[in-house]
Amino acid sequence: MNKVVLLCRPGFEKECAAEITDKAGQREIFGFARVKENSGYVIYECYQPDDGDKLIRELPFSSLIFARQWFVVGELLQHLPPEDRITPIVGMLQGVVEKGGELRVEVADTNESKELLKFCRKFTVPLRAALRDAGVLANYETPKRPVVHVFFIAPGCCYTGYSYSNNNSPFYMGIPRLKFPAEAPSRSTLKLEEAFHVFIPADEWDERLANGMWAVDLGACPGGWTYQLVKRNMWVYSVDNGPMAQSLMDTGQVTWLREDGFKFRPTRSNISWMVCDMVEKPAKVAALMAQWLVNGWCRETIFNLKLPMKKRYEEVSHNLAYIQAQLDEHGINAQIQARQLYHDREEVTVHVRRIWAAVGGRRDER
């Protein structure tokens, strides 16, 4: 199995292909990407037969920006007979996966695939039973075993394969299912909520998104991102010349500062989070974020970088490299992740966490 399917946002196939070609090449896993515009997926075909498996084992999925999900597959199954689609699929997976922990029958995230998605949901139940009988799936779902993927690109036409549960997206089609809260001031609130799900392990939420933390929201108006912080019982400085939603001000947890987010300087020394979703050139935002991190004005940050029309992967890579270089120059240890989230449009969301080492004679924090 030498092919890797990567699901992405429709319209960003070229960026997804450029990224996987670059990052696979850095690990000396060479191949080429097959790209069909607005299809919502990319196929990276490795030159060596076992390199697909090697790629999804060795390259951290968390290091990918434009891929929502990935899995290794074999040859395309075509012209599945309508009276028995199950037998050929089971045959393709036997000897490839043994006692898989979960089955996902998926499609790309396009308008054309919506009808096909309905079929996938109905088809999952009988296929799961057949795969269990064949030993491809375990008799019960387990998160420690590989995930079996059946990816339909057209009716009667699918790829079959697997991903590793410790190096993939835990979400079906790579998309967290989030509900827009009616009391939130704007739909942008879902970007920050999704970022928390993607970047912060669920078992660390109580510690890292804790009650009583202090946070700053730069470019906050009308308060979509502030809402997520308030919902987690944080105290928030919302920085924007534009007005904040009255519902947020009524909580008593929000201090509205009518200032330019680029000029604001915090006066507190215990700010846990800084978040930022400003419409500005990505290089300018990256420079501001680096300044906050280098000066230790926050422990963690989530921010958006708006993408240009062309060379989007190159632009994001350049901005992330700039932030990393600034941190390195000042001897700061940090973890950087970036992802084009489901709720992002022409942008990517970045998470940076400063990590303080325990050094004798020095406080752990700042």
Curated annotation (Swiss-Prot):
Locations listed in the record: Cytoplasm
What cellular-component terms does GO give this entry? Answer: cytoplasm
Q: Which Pfam families match?
A: FtsJ, RlmM_FDX, RLMM_N
Q: Where is the active site?
A: K306
So what does this thing catalyse? cytidine(2498) in 23S rRNA + S-adenosyl-L-methionine = 2'-O-methylcytidine(2498) in 23S rRNA + S-adenosyl-L-homocysteine + H(+)
Q: Which InterPro entries match?
A: RlmM_FDX, RlmM_THUMP-like, RNA_MeTrfase_FtsJ_dom, rRNA_MeTrfase_M, SAM-dependent_MTases_sf
Q: Into which EC class is this enzyme placed?
A: transferase
> Which GO biological process annotations does it have?
methylation; rRNA processing
UniProt: S-adenosyl-L-methionine binding residues: S188, C221, P222, G223, G224, D240, D260, D277
EC number(s) given by UniProt: 2.1.1.186
The domain of life is Bacteria
User: Disulfide connectivity?
Assistant: none
Q: Which UniProt keywords apply?
A: Cytoplasm, Methyltransferase, rRNA processing, S-adenosyl-L-methionine, Transferase
Q: Which GO terms describe its molecular function?
A: S-adenosylmethionine-dependent methyltransferase activity
- What function does the entry list? Catalyzes the 2'-O-methylation at nucleotide C2498 in 23S rRNA.
Tell me, how does this one assemble? Monomer.
Entry-linked PANTHER family: RIBOSOMAL RNA LARGE SUBUNIT METHYLTRANSFERASE M, RIBOSOMAL RNA METHYLTRANSFERASE FTSJ DOMAIN-CONTAINING PROTEIN
Name the family.
Belongs to the class I-like SAM-binding methyltransferase superfamily. RNA methyltransferase RlmE family. RlmM subfamily.
Q: Which HAMAP family match?
A: 23SrRNA_methyltr_M
What is this protein's name? Ribosomal RNA large subunit methyltransferase M
Q: Which organism is it from?
A: Shigella boydii serotype 4 (strain Sb227)
Lineage of origin: Bacteria, Pseudomonadati, Pseudomonadota, Gammaproteobacteria, Enterobacterales
